[in-house]
């Protein structure tokens, strides 16, 4: 065999400094940091099919490690009936759409929906109808608009298969009124899917109390899990559709393609369960930290977008003051990223100064104040250029 001209050494020592050497402000990562117990558990199960040592043919039935018990317990935690592991919220959404809807049906969803909601419904050969938000600067989704969009589709005799709401969106961190949208869906007679990628695992969520029929959950985004991992949690009345089994291989659930996320990601999700169940009790304190950041940074020229006051940790700021400094600094738009990095802070997108997204979820008050003080210092120094 001819010798390959490949430098294999560069793949042997891959390492990452974010999170270990830098305070990570990236909202997509704040809820996914693993506690020590999860890192230890991964060590035991990082080999390929190690969770399948005692598998009887289906992942959700495995007793050692206690996957079966975990799925039962996490269903109670979520206020739902049945749960399965997935590779993430996007896969959870597709599973629901593909099993509950008919080809050509319409999915009614909010204007803040994540791109994966649209990709999932397109993959399932469905159509979308958007409930528009109220625009700048709040981008709020009005639950009553769902009723209007549904009525309009019904007047046109368009088939509706599913109502979808983004519980917390990834752009502005708006916490939507899921209970009201779920009530409208129930009154209209349509199943309701709640995308909880940024909520379950960060704040308390009870699916049935929110009138949800399905929850799409991200483990790596909000449940302190390695990636890729998520959950789909459902009401019992939909179990026969969502968890239907194969004609040729009766033990296998079709929508799961037999088995979904397994190995290290699933083990980390399970090992983090007690940590996650405990931290959601501190949600009020997380909101206080977030509002503190907003209050302090708006004093120096930042402007928080989205609903005020903040009800979620994800913050999006307009930052004209940073853009003004960038015009004077020889590093241009990279100055803010570089100044933060010097101070042991990361997670802000490189080269961005007009708008930034950040989160201090899970940080101590000391760390939060450190972040705020250093951003103030950077702006003060920039104003003196």
Swiss-Prot record:
SUPFAM superfamilies: PLP-dependent transferases (SSF53383)
Record carries keyword Transferase: yes
Residues the record lists as binding pyridoxal 5'-phosphate: 89-90, 195, 218-220
Positions of post-translational N6-(pyridoxal phosphate)lysine modification: 221
InterPro entries: PyrdxlP-dep_Trfase, PyrdxlP-dep_Trfase_major, PyrdxlP-dep_Trfase_small, Sep_Cys-tRNA_synth_arc, SepSecS/SepCysS
Record keyword Transferase present: yes
Cited Gene3D superfamilies: Aspartate Aminotransferase, domain 1, Type I PLP-dependent aspartate aminotransferase-like (Major domain)
GO biological process: translation
Keywords, in A-Z order: Protein biosynthesis, Pyridoxal phosphate, Transferase
Enzyme class per UniProt: transferase
Record-linked Pfam families: SepSecS (PF05889)
Any one GO MF annotation of this record: Sep-tRNA:Cys-tRNA synthase activity
Transmembrane domains' residue ranges: none
Protein family according to the UniProt entry: Belongs to the SepCysS family.
Subunit structure and binding partners: Homodimer. Interacts with SepRS.
Annotated function: Converts O-phospho-L-seryl-tRNA(Cys) (Sep-tRNA(Cys)) to L-cysteinyl-tRNA(Cys) (Cys-tRNA(Cys)).
Family matches, as NCBIfam families: PRK09331.1, SepCysS
Entry protein name: O-phospho-L-seryl-tRNA:Cys-tRNA synthase
Organism of provenance: Methanococcus aeolicus (strain ATCC BAA-1280 / DSM 17508 / OCM 812 / Nankai-3)
Source organism phylogeny: Archaea, Methanobacteriati, Methanobacteriota, Methanomada group, Methanococci
